[in-house]
Amino acid sequence: MKLWFSTLKLKKAAAVLLFSCVALAGCANNQTNASQPAEKNEKTEMKDDFAKLEEQFDAKLGIFALDTGTNRTVAYRPDERFAFASTIKALTVGVLLQQKSIEDLNQRITYTRDDLVNYNPITEKHVDTGMTLKELADASLRYSDNAAQNLILKQIGGPESLKKELRKIGDEVTNPERFEPELNEVNPGETQDTSTARALVTSLRAFALEDKLPSEKRELLIDWMKRNTTGDALIRAGVPDGWEVADKTGAASYGTRNDIAIIWPPKGDPVVLAVLSSRDKKDAKYDDKLIAEATKVVMKALNMNGK
């Protein structure tokens, strides 16, 4: 009799345990299912925010952001092509740093007034003496000097060589074909001198944060970009006070306005961000505020706007 009673109690206990497990599993599934609509709503809200900016500024946006600490991303037209404009200067200097030693950067490059193009704020002052590769990189990244970009591009073998080096680091998208300032004339549907937000983020990360360059050269590249003089109204204007930004801006026909950047919050790992934009008419003007406002949406989507 006692044996029968004990067996009955064991069966009841097992049934209760089984029911509890099923109930817990149901709760877990409910929690998972509950979080999915929330995430979907956040993504919908983010896309709506970007779409509103496009309508407000009469422009098209291409955005990709990567939080390198969590691998979270923000994407809006991340694989649509835009003229890369002067953002390519960051990747050009990245390849230069791959090919040249730190000592080689002291090599002096001579040039003439025939090498000056449409925007040469630094190189035009040094025609008589020439400039070192290091000085040219500084001029290209910090002042967006077009002659400096062209002289560096010639040093690494021209646009075709730049393209080959980008392919080696896994960038199958970015398509350099011309020198400054011709590279800024890109008509809708053309692929020459274009890239995507995702590709630019991936390549910038490879040069500045990963092992495509040794640490000493990464620090040099980042230092130049942190001291950029052309980006105060763009991504820098869209991040909270106290954050560090290393960026490279660009502008081209069809109201193209771009900025690619590495962003360091006070706490946490860097975010790599590309904000690309264009308009419908060839002679359209751009508005820097669009880039700043889009950056704010990215920060909100990454839950970093008040971090």
Swiss-Prot record:
Its main location: membrane. It catalyses: a beta-lactam + H2O = a substituted beta-amino acid. InterPro entries: Beta-lactam/transpept-like, Beta-lactam_cat, Beta-lactam_class-A, Beta-lactam_class-A_AS. SUPFAM superfamilies: beta-lactamase/transpeptidase-like (SSF56601). One of its GO terms (cellular component) is plasma membrane. Substrate binds at K248, T249, G250. GO terms for molecular function: beta-lactamase activity. Transmembrane segments: none annotated. One of its GO terms (biological process) is beta-lactam antibiotic catabolic process. Large exopenicillinase is the primary secretion product; it can be converted to small exopenicillinase. Pfam families: Beta-lactamase2. NCBIfam families: bla_class_A, blaP, classA_firm. This is Beta-lactamase.
